[in-house]
Regions:
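Bacterial N-terminal signal peptides
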Residues: 9-19
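Structural recognition of the beta-strand scaffold that forms the well-ordered cores
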Residues: 34-36, 66-68, 135-140, 163-168, ...
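Catalytic beta-strand/loop cores that center a nucleophilic Ser/Cys/Thr
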Residues: 101, 121-122, 133, 186, ...
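Sec/Tat signal peptide C-region and signal peptidase I cleavage site
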Residues: 21-23
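Bacterial N-terminal signal peptides that target proteins for export
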Residues: 1-11
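Extracellular ligand-binding/catalytic regions of CAZymes and related secreted enzymes
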Residues: 25-31, 37, 45-48, 52-61, ...
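A glycine-rich, often tryptophan-bearing local segment used as a flexible ligand/cofactor-contacting loop or short
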Residues: 130, 136-139, 143-216
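Solvent-exposed loop/turn segments at secondary-structure junctions
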Residues: 39-43, 72-75, 142-146, 164, ...
Length: 383
């Protein structure tokens, strides 16, 4: 039998084909994400917009396949508490209250089967053998105490090398669990910056891929949360914050908006954006969401080491904005002096944290003394 050697061009074609197959084999396929949109507290109307947007983001980018855990249908409607009108007699009001109490009892009975069905859904979705099939989980504006059957085991699953992605009200979820709040990064404590307002924001790392799509300073219309004292700056790398000087109201504390963190071998990405339908439909937000998901899945390299000094500096700038507004000071001049000190010694603002935190517990009319102490530190020479 006669054999012919391959020509040079044929060898080249074969080599290219082999390399292409090798590269294709090295490229990871779409991840599998469990996307949870169940709420046991307030339910955001924008969830109905978020669900198809998330499915589309994963599919069009080849990044992930979304398996949804949605609200079961058929839940009975809870009764609304009566509001006493001015001309309502005591007798009529007592009757209204009694009727409401009876309606509540009936709702509890009617709601019990629905609650049981919800628990069974979570028991199935969060069983160890089910979680083992996922690369991560998304909490998209979840609220309340979700019936996760074994929360410590779920958190350990994330630590084992999985992704957790939280949108908007993910921080208004499972607030009774310190461990969950520590993982996600914060626990909702109000939203003075409402959904109808346009607020100012600052990007701390314009080159970070999770926030590179935003200008360094910009305005955005969405509802913005503040967080309770369990928030730990030493755990998080905050990439985007509320710019207090460009927002109303001006409160004397730092308001982080988007962050990343390592969690054991796992990765956490959280963004507070997502209350409004318009946010979910915005191309810039979609890039932000996709980049955060890609980072959490380990599909892109980007720093995640905590940046408490950056956060402390932004905290001080927020205090300066609020103090200047309250006392009629020159906010720009004060901020320039504070920034000059921070530039010389990045740890200086972090050293003021105990004083700054004390302001959080003061009502506006009781802050003047602490404002004066902070301004004195800024004006103090020699540093």
């Amino acid at each position: 039998m006669a054999y012919r050697s391959l020509g040079w061009s044929a060898c080249l074609v074969l080599a290219v084909a082999v390399c292409a197959v090798t590269r294709a084999a090295e490229q990871p396929g779409p991840a599998r994400l469990l996307v949870v949109t169940v709420t046991t507290g307030f339910r955001h109307a924008s969830i109905a917009t978020a669900e198809p947007v998330l499915e589309e983001l994963g599919r069009e980018r080849g990044l992930f396949h979304a398996d949804f855990l949605r609200m079961p249908p058929g839940r009975p409607t809870a009764p609304r508490a009566p509001q006493r009108k001015k001309d309502t007699s005591d007798e009529a009001w007592a009757a209204e209250q009694a009727a409401f109490k009876a309606a509540q009892e009936k709702f509890k009975q009617d709601d019990a089967p629905w609650q049981q069905g919800l628990k069974e859904q979570f028991a199935t979705a969060f069983a160890p053998e089910a979680l083992a099939t996922f690369d991560g989980v998304v909490f998209a504006s979840t609220t309340g105490d979700l019936p996760i059957p074994d929360l410590p085991a779920f958190l350990e699953w994330i630590k084992s090398g999985k992704a957790f992605i939280g949108f908007h009200a993910a921080t208004d979820t499972l607030k009774s669990s310190d461990a969950y709040c520590e993982m996600v990064g914060g626990a909702f404590a109000g939203h003075p910056w409402t959904a109808g307002g346009e607020h100012g924001f600052v990007v701390h790392e314009p080159g970070h891929p999770v926030v590179a799509m935003f200008p360094e300073r910009f305005r955005w219309k969405d509802e913005i949360y503040q967080y309770d004292p369990r928030y730990k700056p030493e755990n998080l790398r905050v990439l985007l914050s509320l710019d207090m000087a460009a927002s109303t109201p001006q409160e004397p504390w730092h308001v982080p908006v988007a962050w990343v963190r390592d969690y054991g071998k796992g990765r956490v990405f959280a963004t507070n954006f997502g209350h409004n339908d318009a946010t979910w439909n915005d191309p810039v937000f979609k890039k932000h969401a996709a980049a955060g998901i890609a980072w959490a899945l380990g599909r892109m390299a980007a720093p995640a080491a905590p940046n408490p000094e950056v956060q402390a500096a932004e905290y001080l700038r927020s205090v300066v904005a609020a103090a200047a507004a309250a006392g009629g000071h020159d906010a720009d001049a004060l901020r320039a002096r504070a920034d000059a000190k921070i530039a010389k010694d990045p740890s200086w603002a972090a050293g003021l944290r105990p004083l700054l935190l004390e302001l959080r517990g003061r009502k506006p009319d009781a802050r003047a003394e602490l404002y004066a102490q902070v301004l004195a530190e800024i004006e103090k020479p020699g540093r």
